[in-house]
């Protein structure tokens, strides 16, 4: 019996010829990742273990991004703990300030993750790197601490679901809409502890940024990982960027899947996920009148330069509604600089936007755009749970950058064709 791409990567990192769903394996990790929320716990456990050194200073990556720039004394103390540990351990990949950014945009940009890698991160959206053809998954701080010490992680090999996307996308329909549509179909537990393998002619045509967006939200369907087999576009992205030699895996023709789900997305509209779950999706034509107070364009889901350009195309020559706070957050300093050099900031500022430094900030209700009771936001983020972006009586609607920009202009949820 053949293997899926997920099974092949896990087998290789476990030193095995093959791996099957349900197998318990110990696998060597290529990258162990932590941030300013999760790394402090892992560091405390590391200290308690009596370990002196991390297993490999080139493979432990620490990126403060959730409460940065630090918003208060507690967050400053957490970042200080991580900073001190990174310096003590002489980590090669410690990023802060003008060299940092939102971790799941930063690591691909810097080539720290690549095709064929096994990446574990103490952040649920570590699954983002599956867009590059890696097996990447979120773990708790305890597993991160163990990986920092041993270089290994134990995993149960997941079953895989194969998603096949056929047709051709309409204008303003992006990878974000594909994944929202998928989650809306299967539900937030529809891929529980499964590898979601995205395939088909539509995926083949997607640029890397949108592939990363799709993989990023696999966890919102309960997925253990989201993964796209690497191809010529992946190679083009990886060449001269990825610091380790990439390995291109592909599923065997006779690989076994728990399910195969096909979608013809030719007529798919931009999608909007209503509160308070990402599965509550509706096409833009069925949204109705939903006034809003804030728009967030950014995050590890949609904060890349392609997302900035998508928003700018809609905002050009337009202004945000007087009742809408438009906040734009480029995910890394490099994206920030590129957006500035391309003149996108002129467009954003002319539209009345606030441009934030790179941060996760509002996505988790941390800072830089918290909602009050009764307020609604359209966001290009990945979660819209109760209280996710602020008060428990606020609401978050998830959408792609073009829809978010159009909504800012309209003062209500709107599609680009409405502007």
From Swiss-Prot:
Q: Which Pfam families match?
A: Aconitase (PF00330)
The cofactor(s) it depends on are: [4Fe-4S] cluster
Record-level Gene Ontology MF annotations: 3-isopropylmalate dehydratase activity; 4 iron, 4 sulfur cluster binding; metal ion binding
Protein's pathway = Amino-acid biosynthesis; L-leucine biosynthesis; L-leucine from 3-methyl-2-oxobutanoate: step 2/4
Question: What GO terms describe the biological role, i.e. biological process, of this protein?
Answer: L-leucine biosynthetic process
Coiled-coil annotation reads none
What's its catalytic activity?
(2R,3S)-3-isopropylmalate = (2S)-2-isopropylmalate
Q: Relay the cofactor remark from the entry.
A: Binds 1 [4Fe-4S] cluster per subunit.
Positions with a binding annotation for [4Fe-4S] cluster: 300, 360, 363
Task: Say yes or no: keyword Iron-sulfur present.
Answer: yes
Q: Does the keyword Amino-acid biosynthesis apply?
A: yes
Give the signal peptide range.
Answer: none
Alphabetized PROSITE patterns for the sequence: ACONITASE_1 (PS00450), ACONITASE_2 (PS01244)
Q: How does it assemble?
A: Heterodimer of LeuC and LeuD.
Q: What does this protein do?
A: Catalyzes the isomerization between 2-isopropylmalate and 3-isopropylmalate, via the formation of 2-isopropylmaleate.
Q: Which NCBIfam families match?
A: hacA_fam, IPMI_arch, LEU2, PRK00402.1
Say which family it is in: Belongs to the aconitase/IPM isomerase family. LeuC type 2 subfamily.
Q: What is this protein called?
A: 3-isopropylmalate dehydratase large subunit
Native organism? Desulfatibacillum aliphaticivorans
Q: Which gene encodes it?
A: leuC
